[in-house]
Amino acid sequence: EIAQCLVGSEMCIRDSYKTIMKKEDLRIVYMGTPDFAVEALRQLVEGGYNVVGVITMPDKPAGRGHKIQYSPVKQYALEQNLPLLQPERLKDEAFVEALREWKADLQIVVAFRMLPEVVWNMPRLGTFNLHASLLPQYRGAAPINWAVINGDTETGITTFFLKHEIDTGEVIQQVHVPIADTDNVEVVHDKLMVLGGKLVLETVDAILNDTVKPIAQEDMAVVGELRPAPKIFKETCRIDWHSPVKRVYDFIRGLSPYPAAWSELVSPEGEAVVMKIFESEKIYEAHQLAVGTVVTDG
């Protein structure tokens, strides 16, 4: 079959090679930065997949002492003696050439940065991303937060092939995950992190076995309007006490424990103190107090 393909087209050569390739031979480059991205990398390494290189953010000073800290992905990569690149600019010629020398068949992106086409279009089998929502819902930087803030009872995890517009590529696989009424963003994050690692492996296996049937996001059925998941800033986290009880409750758990919902406690003298609120309870009862009044039990 291979000899016949060599006489034919390049596509035929690629398809035959893909059919006979084993996971140990598939050259994978992995890109990610936070804890969420470590789980999938760990499962790839422990599963015997051939991770030939890791790309993560440059080291940055953190904390009051401004000490240089490694990203969680870098820490794991060093522990496993994996080759590592930390580019400042993803279009830098030196970085692109170093990446090309790894000769990746497939690239995997989990919680990293928006990639230029020169990077995501490099591997012969493409580049896929793991996104913490049921795309096309919650495209953007903070999908887990916004799903909880909006009071959703279900979210999920998606793998999709990268294209030019962010989070819009063809969907490969999805897993649905329930959100309990008491879940905060940390609980949902951890659920998706573990399932995401498994989904990455399943996606790699599907690509290896040539069983992928990607679906364009515009062809997917969506209930209701598409909701975005923009980056969250400090002012985004300010509680609006004029909102309904459930809205405030969901808002607090959707930002807990990080970056945390906040409000100002104003003294009779007019002095304001910022306080972060990590947990709340819904209580429905009649009262005559003004909205925003602080009531204590002693």
Regions found by a protein language model. Name each.
Residues 38, 42-46, 96-100, 117, ...:
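Amphipathic, non-transmembrane alpha-helical secondary structure
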Residues 61-105:
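N-terminal glycine-/serine-/threonine-rich beta1-alpha1-beta2 phosphate-ribose binding loop
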Residues 33-36, 88-91, 111-114, 283:
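Short beta->alpha connector loops
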Residues 222-298:
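Internal anion-binding site segments
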Residues 21-65:
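N-terminal Rossmann-like dinucleotide-binding module
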Residues 8, 101-103, 123:
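Alpha-helix C-terminal capping/helix-to-coil transition sites in glycosyltransferase folds
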Residues 1-15:
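Single conserved hydrophobic/aromatic residue that forms the stacking wall/gate
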Residues 26, 47-50, 57, 106-228, ...:
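Donor/substrate-binding cores of folate-linked one-carbon enzymes
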